[in-house]
């Protein structure tokens, strides 16, 4: 059976057993901030198992895409060198949420694996493990299924603590947990290894193919297990592993799915398709990279983006080892889409985007790879011992973008290891240097503990009556706040919008008679709305009745900007592509800021198109529609959800322009798109690798911005004695005149340098037959010094030259060595010494190098290094 047929058979079998087929969730976990990537089928059902979420079904079956690279679960360094390690894999799984339990789960697994209708695996080839004290599972396997005792293995607490076992699953130190039962396939005596639980269990003869987890306990902080009222089942079977078994091959890389990717990789690289570890690395990595990019991850220097960058660069390095010329990795995407696109349509939809991102990252890495490899080669040549120092690993990471595991790959090929502890020390030191001093206000959101949920009335009102439920001062609960005191007020009902989804919290005031509390911000913790501010007059007590008043003008301007972000988001996806995802936003009364995923700067014509599209929707003046519905219905209508946000059973769908923009949003918005009046982008730029930011203004603020721009144009025209109509012509003339003057200046400087060169050459010293000239020429820039060094090399013949200058309060250095000496003396080495002496850095070619620093007082000492440099080198 082909891998695709096995996947479909698994899903179909469990559908016949009353399971709902659920699509794979994103590789970016939406309900677990502690998890870097989705790495198991149960991740998307975590809240179901915890009893925090109810779904319309109690039985589910999935084929879940998973990534294990980075974080706790990291297979990266083993990929390509073993038969079964991958960065990306598919986990087939069936799940029961308080429905069936051990007997049915075991029966389903055995039936699917061994019946002629399904996989038809030989029963005598299957071994089973259970937790040592799980007699129930053991009896089901032996007495009902009929597995002989000699192929049953009880596994106890083999990890040094109670319930710490390969056959006991826990979600954490506390919470749902339970025993598990694993099914192993015996590849036969020709493969070395022993059955599970034996001293030889790490061999490859017995391979785990399916794990059934029985969640039947809740573990409390004291370590005691309490039975769950509704036990559940979580199972997982690796598609690649079971495919290898059914296709009668020992390595996952020999299955049909990988054969097409290996062939495509070999073709793109231009190498033979044989059993090469580097080719396996490339074929594996195209899967994880393709799926991660399709799910919205872009290469960057932190978090998930950094893991993606590491994987891409590792693939590129292994491709280069095999002889790849130029960019090749992106060319394999088409084969990935052909192999897996029918099961995962997001690959088809995002193919061109994946290719663009990979090609861009390859080209960027190529610029630094060659230089970094040369540096590493030099460091390894000087290495004493078998451990690459942490400082070297960090230098390659920090300067050349070499992930530590890429350096580790190169070291492994030479039987070297890395000083990982030293690398981490360097990283820690960098973090300390980078950490800016900052102070934070009182974090009431983590301190306030109120069971009462505030009722929000702000969608339809900006005023109202309310009762004070609680008061806080300096993080402590109090019964009253006096005049002049800052604190937090919690009401039973409020029209104040709490900061969420990028929209700032409302401001305004509360009042009752002569008591007034000025609200500067509103936030939310749990169900409670926190009104932050100060008592302007009187004394406010718990239980008091107050009138609420939101600052209307600020609210109105803010909601226009919020609605504009929705229109901008839709326009971005229309102009740039469906890969655009919101990465963050800030909406206040002055402007809007919108961060989104994109891999390159936006072109001017694209910015103009965005403005045109948004303003066209504004001019249509369509009604902004809101609807309360369930999450599944909202998604079927095409509503976009903000990634990372948690949504309840009921969600609010906001639509503009009919189907132009449909998003889940709980914010305050305009009544009609025409209320926004005008939309103008004021800036666009990058904030991180793969993340762009647009800032824009709307309404009155947009008009004010345009008026200011008009005033600047008039002022510029006045400066060049022109007007708006001929401003460009006037500026062009000024720039042309400036260019001619700069050219004349360069010619004069060249003549002066030539004259200086004649004078300087006479000052050169003879050191062991080498003319050494080291002098300072203050006021000269680097360009002038470079030209002078070239001239002096021609005049002096066999020479070493070091020139320095203090130019615009900085030290400029240029070193030159004539070609006949570069075998013994290198300009780059001299420059490193000289630049370090003035508190800077430098380097370059053996015959020419540049550098600089900040310590002008040390320039003479730096220049004095030239003579001993020659004396020691000759």
UniProtKB/Swiss-Prot annotation:
Pfam family, one: tRNA-synt_2c
Record key words, sorted: Aminoacyl-tRNA synthetase, ATP-binding, Cytoplasm, Ligase, Metal-binding, Nucleotide-binding, Protein biosynthesis, RNA-binding, tRNA-binding, Zinc
InterPro entries named among the record's database cross-references: aa-tRNA-synth_II/BPL/LPL (IPR045864), Ala-tRNA-lgiase_IIc (IPR002318), Ala-tRNA-ligase_IIc_anticod-bd (IPR018162), Ala-tRNA-synth_IIc_core (IPR018165), Ala-tRNA-synth_IIc_N (IPR018164), Ala-tRNA_ligase (IPR050058), Ala_tRNA_ligase_euk/bac (IPR023033), DHHA1_dom (IPR003156)
Reactions accelerated catalytically: tRNA(Ala) + L-alanine + ATP = L-alanyl-tRNA(Ala) + AMP + diphosphate
GO molecular function term, any single one: alanine-tRNA ligase activity
E.C. numbers: 6.1.1.7
CDD domains reported for this sequence: AlaRS_core
GO cellular component: cytosol
Role played: Catalyzes the attachment of alanine to tRNA(Ala) in a two-step reaction: alanine is first activated by ATP to form Ala-AMP and then transferred to the acceptor end of tRNA(Ala). Also edits incorrectly charged Ser-tRNA(Ala) and Gly-tRNA(Ala) via its editing domain.
Entry comment, domain topic: Consists of three domains; the N-terminal catalytic domain, the editing domain and the C-terminal C-Ala domain. The editing domain removes incorrectly charged amino acids, while the C-Ala domain, along with tRNA(Ala), serves as a bridge to cooperatively bring together the editing and aminoacylation centers thus stimulating deacylation of misacylated tRNAs.
Family: Belongs to the class-II aminoacyl-tRNA synthetase family.
Name this protein carries in UniProt: Alanine--tRNA ligase
